[in-house]
Amino acid sequence: MIKTKSKIIDVAKGLFREISVYKATMNDIAKAAKMSRRTLYTHFKSKEELYKYVVEDEVNAINEKLQKAADSRLPPDRKLKLYILQHFGVIDSLTRNNRYIRYDFLFNNIRVEHLRKEIDKKEISLLTGIIREGKERGVFRVTDPKVFSQNLLLMFKSLEQAFILTGHKERNSKTVLEYIDLMFFGIINTENSNLHHG
């Protein structure tokens, strides 16, 4: 039973990637999985439900990668930098390899928000842990780690669409590093700033 369900999810993932979630039908999926439509509908009531499971599969892979970054033994500031790079790396590989998810990220924000609820909860929890550790060690100057983490995630999301549209891996990496520097050190060059003169 579980094997059959996993097989359907894998086949659907491949088909959605190949011909898009909008064009693939339940009939196409049944044929590609070499099973009857009846068997397919025993496991999934609709294509929309199957799509949810396909994305859930991707979400689990994302959560594992983010968890690894959060669990690293680096100091809090370096851990946060690693985490941010991992976040955007995951978005890049997810949208680069999956046209159907890329389309949703770019044009269907409501569905993306629905699909990302679980990732968001996980991310806020992981980020809060990193920020709290940094605050306790005196590395980060923040009042409320959880609120700061929620705002940080909103900032990430505001950058994602431009990041996906650019689609240039090297340029995107440079942009993310610039944002990390901006967040960590600000935009002011203290040596030349008038704020520090008189």
What are the residue ranges of the model-derived segments?
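C-terminal peripheral helix-coil segments that are non-catalytic and often amphipathic
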Residues: 82, 89, 125-137, 154-155, ...
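Secondary-structure edge/capping motif, primarily at the C-terminal ends of alpha-helices
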Residues: 69, 98-105, 163-166
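Short secondary-structure transition hinges
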Residues: 88-128, 136
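Helix-turn-helix
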Residues: 7, 11, 15, 19-49, ...
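Hydrophobic alpha-helical connector segments
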Residues: 53, 67-93, 149-152
